[in-house]
Amino acid sequence: MLPNIQLDALLDEAGMSHAGLAVRVNRAGRARGMSLRYEHTAVARWLKGQRPRGQVPDLLCEVLGTRLRRTVTLDDIGLGVPGAPAPVHTTALCGFVERAAALWRSDAQQRPHLRGTAPVTGTPAVLPVWEWENPPEDTDVSRGGSCRVGRADTGTLRAARTHYEQMYRKAGGVATRARIVGFLNSGTAPLLRGSYSDATGRELLRATGGLVAIAGICAYDSDEQGLAQRYFHQALRLAKASGDRALGAYVVALLVNQALFMREYRQAVAFAEAALRTAGRELTPALGSDLHAMQGKAYAYLGDAGSALACIGRAEEAAGRIRPGAEPDETGYVQPGLVNVQVAEALLRLGDLPAARAQAVAAAAAPAHDRGRVHRLAVLARIELRQGDADRGVATAVEMAVQARGMESRRLRDRLRDVRDDLRGTRFGGADEAAALIEGALRVPL
């Protein structure tokens, strides 16, 4: 059951309390000969995703429409499809914008019913990728609104994406998420509701898609997997509307990474293949190398060594074609050594420790931003410890723990825990001290 953020947004816009809405619904029901006795607790259940019974959804439209002085439909209040919210991709662009903005608003206000939202699975998880791949396209994204949107506005959004990406890399997604969601709510949603031509609109949608993707990354890093998935699906819809296939492939790569984390390995393989196929000539070497590497990792977890090694070969070939300065901003995360650490994890899963260590050493030796370096050191430390090289493994673990200081990331904490657990199984003089150092870091609340 997903929270009804659209009803929540309209209730806030109407300036009604939960109790006030319940009273008005009861009153509207009496006018139709119905005896209703709803209280604020019922409204709270509706906001959590429970579908009201009988004619109550129509009464909600009537009450909110009267208060807002405009027609309010079942789709507007998130009740157009019985039992589930309307899918992101099957709505007109204007409706999608309002739904996206409703999520940003609820998230910015830290509404409790959004916390712990589970990711969708099955067809709802796959449908956004399928619809990104296939027609119809958005033929005209122009819009008439109260404020005129220009290139300066889209430039601001691109600069904001870079700013929050750097903040995420240095401080982690937990610390960054509230900041970027607040900007989406206050600085981005008004632009999407503004006035712009088709050409400017596509630039605006592309810039917004890049921002929303970073919001999804921060939610993923905060272990809010359901929210992360919703942001990624939004970013994919924005990429499709912008007409930028490469941006869409980048967003699908984020979904591949999340699928790996959630152990949906077949889905990761399929999503990576969809991105590689659909982006075609627009696929850059950096993104191609990452997609092939993650696909190889998924095959490794599925126990298909032949397919994993074939993907690793394609990843390494694509990585050799990366040219600094020739990639879009979004693929800047594919820095030297990233493919090496992805390959190291795949080889580790396949049990080839010597080859995995060689890749991990190469990854750790390459320059990387703070977050990436912690990831690489964690992988290297685990391989060294598994090979029985306790001296090097402990030293690498200590370096990792020191590097991770100041970062608020639940994903990095997972890696810290893995290394700590490996250290506890090591009989070496400094292993206990290194494990205690990591344990101390894990006690700090996020």
PLM regions and their residue ranges:
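Short amphipathic recognition helices of helix-turn-helix/homeodomain-type DNA-binding modules
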Residues: M1-R24, S35-N134, D414-R417, A436-L446
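Short acidic, glycine/proline-enriched loop segments that cap or flank alpha-helices
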Residues: A31-M34, Q50-R51, A368-H369, M407
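Conserved binding/catalytic microenvironments
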Residues: G145-L446
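C-terminal segment of N-terminal export signals and the immediately downstream linker at the start
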Residues: W130-R151
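Short, well-ordered amphipathic alpha-helices
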Residues: G20-G29, T188
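Short, flexible, glycine-rich and Lys/Arg-enriched loop motifs at helix boundaries
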Residues: A28-L36, H40, R323-T331
